[in-house]
Amino acid sequence: MGTDYRNSGRGGRDGPGGRGPGNDRRDSGRSFGDRRPERPDFKRGDGGRGFGDRRGSGPPGGPDRGDRRGPRDGPGGRGGPGGPGGGFKGGAKTMVKPHPKYDGIFISHGRGDVLVTKSLAPGVAVYGEKRISVEGTESKIEYREWNPFRSKLGAAVRLNVLDMPIKPGAKVLYLGAASGTTVSHVSDIVGPTGAVYAVEFSQRSGRDLLEVAKARTNVYPIIADARHPYKYRMIVPEVDCIFSDVAQPDQARIVAENARYYLKANGGMLISIKASSVDSTLKPEAVFAREIETLREHDFKCKEQLDIGEFHRNHAIVVGRFRVKAA
């Protein structure tokens, strides 16, 4: 007679070492995917993110990791609508008020104060940002959260930059537009009467930028090298402001060349400088000082050097005006 293995090793079902009654997976209804204890069912939007939270520590208020990306043109995708999970609705506890210092920028007062811009393309998320729907006098108004950790310009606004030439109706030349994250917020700020001429050299980022422009009639994507501004002179008119984020060793010279072609007298300039991209052998303070001196040599009057290292390590925003006219 053979050995009965059913009662050896792990033990019988109800015996010592066995699963015990009620522990059979078939009886409990639990699958391999259910081994972890269940989490509370947090809804997206139960808790806003304050200025200081880069990614948050999970619910409440944080996006599920599985929801970060969707199909490119589908709900939640970079180039498509954000879908039902792409934003949160404003309610009685959420108030959106104009920024006290900057035209075209707003602050959402809810579970934490958050920078937002009024969406020029309601229903469309650009980089998975949260969206707030607020009841207006005639219809709902959608605002988009502006994350300072994802945008150098957003960081400058969060840190109360002195001069903000980007405002409703402005024409902006944006150098180093990348995938269009900050471009989309600039588009919101300048509104339908303004324009954003977004220059990007990378073909891959340029494709994403084109997707952003499809939903925004005031964005003019230009796939070109910002070192040669004459190549897009047939597209770009005289502008009110230049914002630059090209992260190149000769960035100050690139800005100066573009200003010579397109920036009006007394026009605004904001340049994001990453110290290690200019000269990794020098301390950041020395790099910033050298770039400011280069700008001054090209008719810029620099008004402020703003350290945004709190949001972007070894970065500074230099703010100035071009060919300032004497009073």
From Swiss-Prot:
Residues 1-96 are annotated as: Disordered. S-adenosyl-L-methionine binds at residues 181-182, 200-201, 225-226, 245-248. Residues 22-56 have a biased composition (Basic and acidic residues). The modification Asymmetric dimethylarginine is found at residues 10, 19, 44, 49, 55, 65, 69, 78. Pfam families: Fibrillarin. By homology to other fibrillarins, some or all of the N-terminal domain arginines are modified to asymmetric dimethylarginine (DMA). It is found in: Nucleus, Nucleolus. GO terms for biological process: box C/D sno(s)RNA 3'-end processing. Keywords: Methylation, Methyltransferase, Nucleus, Ribonucleoprotein, RNA-binding, rRNA processing, S-adenosyl-L-methionine, Transferase. Residues 73-90 have a biased composition (Gly residues). It catalyses: L-glutaminyl-[histone H2A] + S-adenosyl-L-methionine = N(5)-methyl-L-glutaminyl-[histone H2A] + S-adenosyl-L-homocysteine + H(+). GO terms for cellular component: box C/D methylation guide snoRNP complex; nucleolus; small-subunit processome. GO terms for molecular function: histone H2AQ104 methyltransferase activity; RNA binding; rRNA methyltransferase activity. It comes from the Eukaryota. Component of box C/D small nucleolar ribonucleoprotein (snoRNP) particles. It is associated with the U3, U8 and U13 small nuclear RNAs. Belongs to the methyltransferase superfamily. Fibrillarin family. HAMAP family: RNA_methyltransf_FlpA (MF_00351). S-adenosyl-L-methionine-dependent methyltransferase that has the ability to methylate both RNAs and proteins. Involved in pre-rRNA processing. Utilizes the methyl donor S-adenosyl-L-methionine to catalyze the site-specific 2'-hydroxyl methylation of ribose moieties in pre-ribosomal RNA. Site specificity is provided by a guide RNA that base pairs with the substrate. Methylation occurs at a characteristic distance from the sequence involved in base pairing with the guide RNA. This is rRNA 2'-O-methyltransferase fibrillarin. It comes from Giardia intestinalis (Giardia lamblia).
